[in-house]
């Protein structure tokens, strides 16, 4: 559930700024808009042709998504607790070679690969998930080099994100406030 401004920012970042010294990780990729934007940018980045986007989601339709889906092409396509992974795969088919799908519960997920250069977080919907993401992914960030995009930073309904940013203020500074969205990049 992203804006065109966010998608443009992600595409531009992956095409022009991303250096390929660490992974791109998309937490809470939903139906693939952010994953596609990052993959499109990677395709334009000559320094990172072999890189991939690691897309994480539980891919389970939640009752909360019903209101968002109303009036959209996906309205009525999914059942609560059913998988929407096939829809994600259909939408991202064109970029399948540069996307690694991780169908995982982020309260249990643990990054096991190389360093993370870019971490997009659209999954800190509860304090428990936020804590798990901090433990499972943040230790792999490159000091002074990685970017963390917090998709829900501008919203008052996820105050734990602001508390996390405050606690980590000595390690992160604001790089961008993406217009027309709730995303802040550190």
Language model feature labels by segment:
Residues 10-14:
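Pre-Walker A adenine-sensing motif
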Residues 15-186:
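S-adenosylmethionine/decaboxylated-SAM
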Residues 1-9:
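Conserved SAM-binding loop and adjacent beta-strand
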